[in-house]
From Swiss-Prot:
Gene name of this polypeptide: rplQ
Keyword Ribonucleoprotein in annotation: yes
Lineage: Bacteria, Bacillati, Bacillota, Bacilli, Lactobacillales
Keyword terms of this UniProt record: Ribonucleoprotein, Ribosomal protein
A GO molecular function held by the record: structural constituent of ribosome
Family of this protein: Belongs to the bacterial ribosomal protein bL17 family.
Subunit structure: Part of the 50S ribosomal subunit. Contacts protein L32.
PANTHER family xref list: LARGE RIBOSOMAL SUBUNIT PROTEIN BL17M (PTHR14413:SF16), RIBOSOMAL PROTEIN L17 (PTHR14413)
Alphabetized InterPro entries for the sequence: Ribosomal_bL17, Ribosomal_bL17_CS, Ribosomal_bL17_sf
GO-annotated cellular components: cytosolic large ribosomal subunit
Protein name (record): Large ribosomal subunit protein bL17
Swiss-Prot/TrEMBL GO biological process terms: translation
Amino acid sequence: MSYRKLGRTSSQRKALLRDLTTDLLINERIVTTEARAKEVRSTAEKMITLGKRGDLHARRQAAAYVRNEIASVEEQDDNSVVVKSALQKLFSDLAPKYADRKGGYTRILKTAPRRGDGAPMVIIELV
């Protein structure tokens, strides 16, 4: 299996990809470098495919990878607050959205290079 090292150790790279994948699932659009985006595309598509499967084993596999972060907070009419995590958003919002799609859930758009070091920057978003 080939992958990009991204100039980091194995554990740092795994943490970076977990964070970026979780941020992409929560915000549905992030700005990052081209190399990172191409790696995140792979993991994000795997997570959405797990979400589409929807069984208990898929939920546990996704929970092992996606960070436990708050995706949204909503107030109900009776003054109660509903907090939705990134994992809940994946299975309840994103999976039904892509139910009829067989892959290609992300899009990478090139933008201007980063000002400090000229690194190629992109916007990666969910289609």
